[in-house]
Amino acid sequence: MAERKFFGTDGIRGLVGEGPITPEFVLKLGWAAGRVLSQQGTKKVLIGKDTRISGYMLESALEAGLAAAGLQQFTGPMPTPAVAYLTRTFRAEAGIVISASHNPYYDNGIKFFSSEGTKLPDAIELAIEAEMEKPLTCVESAMLGKAYRINDAAGRYIEFCKGTFPSQYDLSEYKIVVDCAHGATYHIAPNVFRELGAEVITIGCEPNGININDQVGATDVRALQAKVLEEKADFGIALDGDGDRVIMVDNEGNKVDGDQIAYIVARDALRRGELKGGVVGTLMTNLGMEVALKNLGIPFVRSKVGDRYVMEELQKHNWLIGAENSGHVILLDKITTGDGIVAGLQVMASIVGSKMTLKELSDGMTLFPQVLENIRFKGEGNPLESDAVIAAQKAVEAKLGDTGRVLLRKSGTEPLIRVMVEGENADLVQQYALEIAQAVKDNC
């Protein structure tokens, strides 16, 4: 297969104003995507965006390109999972999201969903890239596309989310803190939980275009932890900027990550006799999850890092539950992509159904100490091929033996080298991670 030039593991992403996230590029991308998608079936696409200030500029450019290719567009501010869901209900040929997910406001990106609400196949992404090499042309005036606003997009998605929560349950006995990262779920998630009966306290629900993911949300739960303790809430839930990640916090302020959420959902499905197959994690998934699932007799496999690879393994095994510890939780019996609100609701259903607290549920899985170091580099060359870095990794692996793991990889979405070390002794794990990280820094 040819190598993709622009598309990464989660669409096209970068710093706004620099290639490829410029109005010129996005206009051409919209045109090329429109040309390719119009050959697949209906000439209709859905567009959603998060709360970044640059989203308005990029949306206009994308709409112009799609219109030049003759595609009709249905638009509205909505989370990534809502785009995946509504693409199917609108019978659109594709869904397009303008977002950089958990990244800061000065980044943005474009990602596509197929008509089935799943990530676009590699072949379609390659076809779009090939089309971009051609000169931009315009369909005849009578064939030009047009953009339409979906006025009830939020309401449609709220009802969908509520529909994934068991009808015999409600949340009337629970106080919940909801952190929306000043992102796309700010006008949706609080209403979902309120309409199910919960007492809801909100943080991260005042977007201004530049505060998305800023010390709030799934990538930084310190504010949520403090608010849960201050309000004496039963638990808290944090979403990221585009709503496809979720991290929870128990009543004692402990973080409950994507691994633990998947474990809770799988164990509850097993308790109800409804578990189909096993669970897919990634190379970053904590060893504690693997051990806990094994003790329950639940099969477990690892994929490469990235929700698209988790999805590939789920489809390969015909399983339903997959997750990344960063908070991407995929529940294929509910929706075709990672959905923070829906995943959180399934944990809440387990809390209500088992009459256990979030802490009691998550305590069934003991996390191994794990340290992740992120080293920024210019993106040139590959520090991971350095003899010094390879030697440092091998030295740590020899010390850990069978009691831990080391993983070094390039980020698929940012110019970062990620160093992960996991083992039984927290102090040693921290020391080993810093040793390898220093070797990487010395060779960047």
UniProtKB/Swiss-Prot annotation:
Presence of keyword Phosphoprotein: yes
Modification Phosphoserine, positions: S101
EC assignment: 5.4.2.10
The entry's keywords: Isomerase, Magnesium, Metal-binding, Phosphoprotein
Posttranslational modification: Activated by phosphorylation.
Cofactor remark: Binds 1 Mg(2+) ion per subunit.
Residues the record lists as binding Mg(2+): S101, D240, D242, D244
Active site: S101
Top EC class for this record: isomerase
GO-annotated molecular function: magnesium ion binding; phosphoglucosamine mutase activity; phosphomannomutase activity
Taxonomic superkingdom: Bacteria
Catalytic activities: alpha-D-glucosamine 1-phosphate = D-glucosamine 6-phosphate
Any one of the GO CC terms: cytosol
UniProt-listed Gene3D superfamilies: Alpha-D-Glucose-1,6-Bisphosphate, subunit A, domain 3, Alpha-D-phosphohexomutase, C-terminal domain
Cofactor(s) needed: Mg(2+)
GO BP: any one term: carbohydrate metabolic process
Family of this protein: Belongs to the phosphohexose mutase family.
Cited PANTHER family: PHOSPHOGLUCOMUTASE (ALPHA-D-GLUCOSE-1,6-BISPHOSPHATE-DEPENDENT) (PTHR42946:SF1), PHOSPHOHEXOSE MUTASE (PTHR42946)
Role played: Catalyzes the conversion of glucosamine-6-phosphate to glucosamine-1-phosphate.
Protein name: Phosphoglucosamine mutase
